[in-house]
Amino acid sequence: MTPNYKSVPIMEGPTVVKWDGIYYLFYSCNHFRNIDYSVGYATASNPYGPWTKHPNNPIIHKSIVGENGSGHGDLFKGFDGRYYYVYHVHNTGNNVVPRKTRIVPLIVTKGQDGIYSVTVDKDNVIVPTYE
């Protein structure tokens, strides 16, 4: 098993989208070598903040998607109209690099307060194949 890398608190790899007048900041936290590297998000009514972290963070983490070091990616809308998040994971349980790519469908649900809740369709993680 890879020793769990220790570092100062880190937030990096930001992506900001605006849905129905609210800004959503997706970010990665922890160091990429840490097995708990993960993705969370925060919301704000202004791109300058203040930002409010979502209470159900992280949305992508080894406990959710089943692989160490699951973080630092980007959001995109697929041809099917769904949102997806592409990210990387550790190579194996014993090696961080070279990292591998994963894509997970997002489940985006609008709450009564007008704020979208974002979770992942963890049973449908896409594992790209390379030729």
PLM feature spans:
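Carbohydrate-active catalytic/glycan-binding domains of CAZyme proteins
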Residues: 1-131
